[in-house]
Design a protein with these regions (language model features):
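Structural motif corresponding to the intra-repeat A-B loop/turn of tetratricopeptide repeats
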Residues: 6, 49, 85-89
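Long C-terminal appendages of proteins
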Residues: 61-80, 84-88
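"A position-specific structural signal for the A-helix of alpha-solenoid helical repeats
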Residues: 37, 41-45, 74-84, 110-112
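Boundary/linker segments of alpha-helical solenoid repeat arrays
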Residues: 24-29, 66-76, 101-112
Length: 112
């Protein structure tokens, strides 16, 4: 069930980006995790809707997360989407294999 169409998602994501860009790593772990989750959800909706003008902004916000292991999966999944949208099958398949090799098949089943 979709709550927003792609235009509404883009609008709300733009607001999120404006607020958190270049300073996200200074927020609490909980806030960073929430924003990372929203970014991944936005990328998934871009895939489902085959559009989304703020994909690069989602990548940027994820790159602004603190460099701690607990947030590392966001970067891995971000790279998967980035390679998938850029049709770099060698790289996104290597991430897919990495996830499977590490027992994370559940992630793979949810990815494009």
């Amino acid at each position: 069930m979709l709550l927003f169409d792609q235009d509404e998602l883009d609008y709300h994501f733009k607001q999120l980006f404006k607020f958190y860009r270049c300073k996200l790593s200074g927020f609490s772990f909980h806030t960073q995790k929430l924003v990372g989750t929203i970014c991944i959800n936005y990328l998934q909706n871009c895939y489902l809707n085959q559009e989304g003008e703020y994909r690069e902004k989602a990548y940027e916000l994820i790159d602004d997360l603190a460099l701690i292991p607990d947030l590392g999966m966001f970067r891995i999944i971000k790279n998967y989407y980035k390679y998938w949208f850029n049709h770099d099958s060698i790289k996104y398949r290597s991430i897919r294999k990495f996830l499977i090799d590490n027992g994370l098949e559940e992630f793979v089943h949810r990815l494009p």
